[in-house]
Amino acid sequence: MGVLVISLLVVHLLAFSVCVQGGYRRGGHHPGGHMGPWINAHATFYGGGDASGTMGGACGYGNLYSQGYGLETAALSTALFDQGLSCGACFELMCVNDPQWCIKGRSIVVTATNFCPPGGACDPPNHHFDLSQPIYEKIALYKSGIIPVMYRRVRCKRSGGIRFTINGHSYFNLVLVTNVGGAGDVHSVSMKGSRTKWQLMSRNWGQNWQSNSYLNGQSLSFVVTTSDRRSVVSFNVAPPTWSFGQTYTGGQFRY
């Protein structure tokens, strides 16, 4: 399987860096772990002490443990969720300006995996994070209930490649894209069969992307593009014998 990492203004047009198995040539790579300034917000928690109530969610990730996101997750308010386009993004948070409840000197990094619907703290235009309880308790005491925080976007560090779970049926391929490094938030996916041209997929919901082409019996390749306009192209991720319900692993962003 060959893997190309492309920095571009328009998908497939201008390549600045290439990553092939065993080698990497620098080009448009963005160094550093953080992607934006510190911004004021608030945070609460949900899901119980074992975070079991955080499973599923509006991003479509399902079991957050098996998908590799674990306890370090958050539901985002409307202002941050961006109708699901923020799914997979990573944020660093620290509790501030509340010495009674903040645990001094600690910060956490969480992945956006769910939506916090309007109502109370999550009403627009509030910037609000509803964290899993275990990760909340790393920066604040349980009894605090709600805390002021500062947050910033950071690059996601993932183990292994981007994962593609193929659901649906013939003429309806619904692909869940998970474990995305770098910016983390997928804004575009294209796919091709070994006998077809590249085709842009449409986002169905969360991070589920669909194609209505008949691709049975063909090896499948994918292009994943994140909000920073960087892309990873993974050739022949799924073999011709692929089947619905299975997960296949491709390349990964450099960070």
Curated annotation (Swiss-Prot):
Membrane topology listed for this record: Peripheral membrane protein
Pfam families (UniProt xref): DPBB_1, Expansin_C
PROSITE patterns: EXPANSIN_CBD, EXPANSIN_EG45
Keyword vocabulary terms for this entry: Cell wall, Cell wall biogenesis/degradation, Disulfide bond, Membrane, Secreted, Signal
Disulfide bond residue pairs: 59-87, 90-156, 95-102
Subcellular location: Secreted, Cell wall; Membrane
SUPFAM superfamilies xref list: Barwin-like endoglucanases, PHL pollen allergen
GO cellular component, one term: membrane
Alphabetical GO biological process terms: plant-type cell wall loosening; primary root development; unidimensional cell growth
Stretches assigned to the Expansin-like CBD domain: 171-250
Chief location category: secreted
Keyword Signal attributed: yes
InterPro entries recorded: Expan_Lol_pI (IPR007118), Expansin (IPR002963), Expansin/allergen_DPBB_dom (IPR007112), Expansin_CBD (IPR007117), Expansin_CBD_sf (IPR036749), RlpA-like_DPBB (IPR009009), RlpA-like_sf (IPR036908)
Signal sequence, start to end: 1-22
Family per similarity comment: Belongs to the expansin family. Expansin A subfamily.
Name of the protein described by the UniProt record: Expansin-A5
